[in-house]
Amino acid sequence: MMYDNEEELYEEENAEEISHELWQEACWIVINAYFDEKGLVRQQLDSFDEFIQMSVQRIVEDSPAIELQAEAQHTSGEVETPPRFSLKFEQIYLSKPTHWEKDGSPSPMMPNEARLRNLTYSAPLYVDITKTKNVEGLDPVETQHQKTFIGKIPIMLRSTYCLLSQLTDRDLTELNECPLDPGGYFIINGSEKVLIAQEKMATNTVYVFSMKDGKYAFKTEIRSCLEHSSRPTSTLWVNMMARGSQNIKKSAIGQRIIAILPYIKQEIPIMIVFRALGFVADRDILEHIIYDFDDPEMMEMVKPSLDEAFVVQEQNVALNFIGARGARPGVTKDKRIKYAKEILQKEMLPHVGVSDFCETKKAYFLGYMVHRLLLASLGRRELDDRDHYGNKRLDLAGPLLAFLFRGLFKNLMKEVRMYTQKFIDRGKDFNLELAIKTNIITDGLRYSLATGNWGDQKKAHQARAGVSQVLNRLTFASTLSHLRRVNSPIGRDGKLAKPRQLHNTLWGMLCPAETPEGAAVGLVKNLALMAYISVGSQPSPILEFLEEWSMENLEEIAPSAIADATKIFVNGCWVGIHRDPEQLMATLRKLRRQMDIIVSEVSMIRDIRDREIRIYTDAGRICRPLLIVENGSLLLKKTHVEMLKERDYNNYSWQVLVASGVVEYIDTLEEETVMIAMSPYDLKQDKDYAYCTTYTHCEIHPAMILGVCASIIPFPDHNQSPRNTYQSAMGKQAMGVYITNFHVRMDTLAHVLYYPMKPLVTTRSMEYLRFRELPAGINSIVAILCYTGYNQEDSVILNASAVERGFFRSVFYRSYKDSENKRVGDQEENFEKPHRGTCQGMRNAHYDKLDDDGIIAPGIRVSGDDVVIGKTITLPENDDELDSNTKRFSKRDASTFLRNSETGIVDQVMLTLNSEGYKFCKIRVRSVRIPQIGDKFASRHGQKGTCGIQYRQEDMAFTCEGLAPDIIINPHAIPSRMTIGHLIECLQGKLGSNKGEIGDATPFNDAVNVQKISTFLQEYGYHLRGNEVMYNGHTGRKINAQVFLGPTYYQRLKHMVDDKIHSRARGPVQILVRQPMEGRARDGGLRFGEMERDCQISHGAAQFLRERLFEVSDPYRVHICNFCGLIAIANLRNNTFECKGCKNKTQISQVRLPYAAKLLFQELMSMNIAPRLMVT
């Protein structure tokens, strides 16, 4: 399209702009496109795909070839060199998830089959091996072993290699899978496991911290780690000593600077390290540290360090100095120098390079670290913040599994080497298939995923615990939230408040509301809705590009040039300097927006004040999409939005938006160098009133800073902040439909609400959480009213008639499982109906409900301690004539009983074979849970309450329309908690039910306010603030107050009285102390603790105290010798007593004391301490 003059062009552009009114819809179209393409667990899937497609191959290729040679045999004088073998592992292949039955027949494994049969959903891994045989004087012989099986890798559901990845909703339904299930978890032994993202400090980054009080005033540290390498991180510290013991002034000039190198026990003066790298002259060293010699302050700071290292002036002397302080003392000087060289080359700053000839680069980097230290101590650059989220990386499934696989593959290679070496030493050839122990990888991965101990099974105490967790399936929202969880591996008992606090840099990356209460507060976090975690990309294209774009290499420049130029870092490694940083940044940004050379997840930061450009391409950076603003207007135009609206037909998608440079991903560090407008309205403000005119980006919608659980809350911006946190925790316990295929699943526990409703008042974000399709609550008519006093202290009154009609009724499923395992020896297990005549150890329970095959039939009502699975174990035949009385039993009972506190109906029975090929059975029992007094309910604003009483409709208060509320809550619940969102939701719901449309309660939305809602309500003839006149249900008289009433969305939580009720009169006791057991499951007693004891003492209730702590707990009697006070021998049958020590047979008293006290006395006696009881 050609324009005659510029004005037309300008008008055309203006027409393209999105107006403020249209923006309310436009931004949600963009967000829709994002979630359509990405879903909510993309970060898990992408990370796993990266592991399968890249990391596994890289690990296999990086492992060195196995070189084998037999010991030379000196037999007949002449020595012949035995043949040499080498094994190289090459290309890997991953098949589709497969299951091999016991008879060896393979079949594709479907996830639901894996869940039901307790299998592991994993795919076989194959590798090509090249075997080379070198015999002296002959050509090497190469043999290829194609596709050798080396183990199975668990597959993440819905990832590229999963069987479900490309299926349509219909196909999924036919496979008994829920189309709404997001995937992102593994199935290990039939249970669903999710890998929690682990937070860690970023490697290869220089940090400067000031030390409060210690021998150092400042500390610079860098934890170097080669990208994708098995070597553990090696840390280098460059520290500035504190002056004396008196308190350190921060402006203290001239302290010694020392380095702490890996594997070197003592501190090494920094100048000696430089000399060991081959920079001997003072001037050379200083050039690498202080780039500008006209800086007297800095020169002054390094003086003491120069003086300290004055004695060492040659490289070898310096190397010897370092080597002497190394691990092995008492070796020759050459050895020491070699050792020091090795450490400087391999262990110090390995990310700069571990090959030869990296000395210049290392010297520059070390100089840079000292430079940073000096800047910090002079107060010219602020210190680093440990809790800044830019300094953090998240390890997802990919890096975690790669770490595990690397170790296991190493073990596998070790085993192969040992096995083959044995054969070669005997002069035989070996079979590769037998040399490879496939279960090393299979079992290693399965063990870590099953237990959550991340690391080697043999060193379980070193491993991180709780990395893999069982996926929470209580509600759909709790599942989604669990898949997006982030964990900081800081000890939960630490009293440090800093890591737990909400840091500014978390904006838009992690949810500000969703964190647990108690010990883990602030350490367990959740991703915000649009946050994404980078999977990492290769830095090589960027390095090549920089070479072309006039970046000067460190080896080629004069050190004096650095002072004026800008340093360039790629992934923390200093690669060079550049004279025109602004131009370079513009070019880099342009390339990233066109997705040319540079991937969209790469971040680039230009620190203008410190003259640095930092580029990061590594994995685990958390980033989020923002709209790009240029010259004060959005690059997103109406045409883009129109195209997105039609994206089902025209192949337009989120990815196209990113590729066309309208949206870009910004990570936490880069976010600090850009200027973000909250909405396009900010861009359009008058120049005179505007807060800023140089915006570079714009938020898509501020509601996207919230996470999964907080996005369900209506009007969260009108609630006090801890209330949102409480609801985020409670939303995970609400009952609803947790997944659509629950009828074919055999979950251990499941709660399903009878009539879930979608809320009348929703947020726009809910669509992506599928809360409309899988809701967890009911729109109930709620009155806020003091009525009969049965709703004091956060209890609620329910309408009994509504409950009879099915209000908040739910069904509870519990599964029981058992299998016929083969025992050691000739004991075998069988499912059958045990008979009292032949079976030992049968309980007095109902065995007659079982069928003849030993398994209960569906539809039978069962109650506590009924048998659901009958199983017997054959006893070994005993040949002794003595035990003639036990002879009649040939079997022992090993049945499964229903939990003693539950009742229900057998819902479904499944019989199949497990992975070992044994008979395997799962039984699901259902019970109906009707709301009753003591059950817990909550609104979506952290307003939880238990049911205090239920009144029939006739006894409830009612309005003039005859409307009786379902729930009455107490007005005292509102003022101190300031949950205004609760009230606005009620008002909005009242309007919505009259208007016949769903209310919008998205946070940070200017379009909705109380004023508008009130005006509309008035049009429908209601009181503008939602109050009603009500009448007392008992007397029929008008209540002397206006009552706030309307529909509010309430949730039923999983805490029910039936699962909690517990009492005990008599029951089992512990064997050791003979005191009652603990806990409801074991029918235990209630503990009368120390504090209760103290109260009774202060009351002086001595007899009651004796009864509680002695008579109803563990009474016991012993006989005590009156002379020595020790326990005597008593034979009550013959009435003979004697104390062996005193030869006393008459002076003996009976003493009653707690059994625990008797045990303590005897344990003391075993330690040679005699507690003597003085009896009179």
From Swiss-Prot:
<dbReference type="InterPro" id="IPR015712">
    <property type="entry name" value="DNA-dir_RNA_pol_su2"/>
</dbReference>
<keyword id="KW-0863">Zinc-finger</keyword>
<dbReference type="GO" id="GO:0032549">
    <property type="term" value="F:ribonucleoside binding"/>
</dbReference>
<feature type="binding site">
    <location>
        <position position="794"/>
    </location>
    <ligand>
        <name>Mg(2+)</name>
    </ligand>
</feature>
<dbReference type="Pfam" id="PF04560">
    <property type="entry name" value="RNA_pol_Rpb2_7"/>
</dbReference>
<dbReference type="GO" id="GO:0006366">
    <property type="term" value="P:transcription by RNA polymerase II"/>
</dbReference>
<feature type="binding site">
    <location>
        <position position="1142"/>
    </location>
    <ligand>
        <name>Zn(2+)</name>
    </ligand>
</feature>
<keyword id="KW-0460">Magnesium</keyword>
<dbReference type="GO" id="GO:0005665">
    <property type="term" value="C:RNA polymerase II, core complex"/>
</dbReference>
<keyword id="KW-0240">DNA-directed RNA polymerase</keyword>
<dbReference type="GO" id="GO:0003677">
    <property type="term" value="F:DNA binding"/>
</dbReference>
<feature type="zinc finger region" description="C4-type">
    <location>
        <begin position="1121"/>
        <end position="1142"/>
    </location>
</feature>
<dbReference type="InterPro" id="IPR037033">
    <property type="entry name" value="DNA-dir_RNAP_su2_hyb_sf"/>
</dbReference>
<dbReference type="InterPro" id="IPR007121">
    <property type="entry name" value="RNA_pol_bsu_CS"/>
</dbReference>
<feature type="binding site">
    <location>
        <position position="1124"/>
    </location>
    <ligand>
        <name>Zn(2+)</name>
    </ligand>
</feature>
<protein>
    <recommendedName>
        <fullName>DNA-directed RNA polymerase II subunit RPB2</fullName>
        <ecNumber>2.7.7.6</ecNumber>
    </recommendedName>
</protein>
<dbReference type="GO" id="GO:0005739">
    <property type="term" value="C:mitochondrion"/>
</dbReference>
<dbReference type="GO" id="GO:0008270">
    <property type="term" value="F:zinc ion binding"/>
</dbReference>
<dbReference type="InterPro" id="IPR007644">
    <property type="entry name" value="RNA_pol_bsu_protrusion"/>
</dbReference>
<keyword id="KW-0862">Zinc</keyword>
<dbReference type="Pfam" id="PF04567">
    <property type="entry name" value="RNA_pol_Rpb2_5"/>
</dbReference>
<dbReference type="InterPro" id="IPR014724">
    <property type="entry name" value="RNA_pol_RPB2_OB-fold"/>
</dbReference>
<dbReference type="Pfam" id="PF00562">
    <property type="entry name" value="RNA_pol_Rpb2_6"/>
</dbReference>
<dbReference type="InterPro" id="IPR007647">
    <property type="entry name" value="RNA_pol_Rpb2_5"/>
</dbReference>
<dbReference type="InterPro" id="IPR007646">
    <property type="entry name" value="RNA_pol_Rpb2_4"/>
</dbReference>
<dbReference type="InterPro" id="IPR007642">
    <property type="entry name" value="RNA_pol_Rpb2_2"/>
</dbReference>
<keyword id="KW-0548">Nucleotidyltransferase</keyword>
<dbReference type="Pfam" id="PF04566">
    <property type="entry name" value="RNA_pol_Rpb2_4"/>
</dbReference>
<feature type="binding site">
    <location>
        <position position="1121"/>
    </location>
    <ligand>
        <name>Zn(2+)</name>
    </ligand>
</feature>
<dbReference type="InterPro" id="IPR007120">
    <property type="entry name" value="DNA-dir_RNAP_su2_dom"/>
</dbReference>
<dbReference type="Pfam" id="PF04561">
    <property type="entry name" value="RNA_pol_Rpb2_2"/>
</dbReference>
<dbReference type="InterPro" id="IPR037034">
    <property type="entry name" value="RNA_pol_Rpb2_2_sf"/>
</dbReference>
<dbReference type="InterPro" id="IPR007645">
    <property type="entry name" value="RNA_pol_Rpb2_3"/>
</dbReference>
<dbReference type="InterPro" id="IPR007641">
    <property type="entry name" value="RNA_pol_Rpb2_7"/>
</dbReference>
<feature type="binding site">
    <location>
        <position position="1139"/>
    </location>
    <ligand>
        <name>Zn(2+)</name>
    </ligand>
</feature>
<dbReference type="GO" id="GO:0003899">
    <property type="term" value="F:DNA-directed RNA polymerase activity"/>
</dbReference>
<keyword id="KW-0804">Transcription</keyword>
<comment type="function">
    <text>DNA-dependent RNA polymerase catalyzes the transcription of DNA into RNA using the four ribonucleoside triphosphates as substrates. Second largest component of RNA polymerase II which synthesizes mRNA precursors and many functional non-coding RNAs. Proposed to contribute to the polymerase catalytic activity and forms the polymerase active center together with the largest subunit. Pol II is the central component of the basal RNA polymerase II transcription machinery. It is composed of mobile elements that move relative to each other.</text>
</comment>
<keyword id="KW-0479">Metal-binding</keyword>
<dbReference type="Pfam" id="PF04563">
    <property type="entry name" value="RNA_pol_Rpb2_1"/>
</dbReference>
<comment type="similarity">
    <text>Belongs to the RNA polymerase beta chain family.</text>
</comment>
<dbReference type="Pfam" id="PF04565">
    <property type="entry name" value="RNA_pol_Rpb2_3"/>
</dbReference>
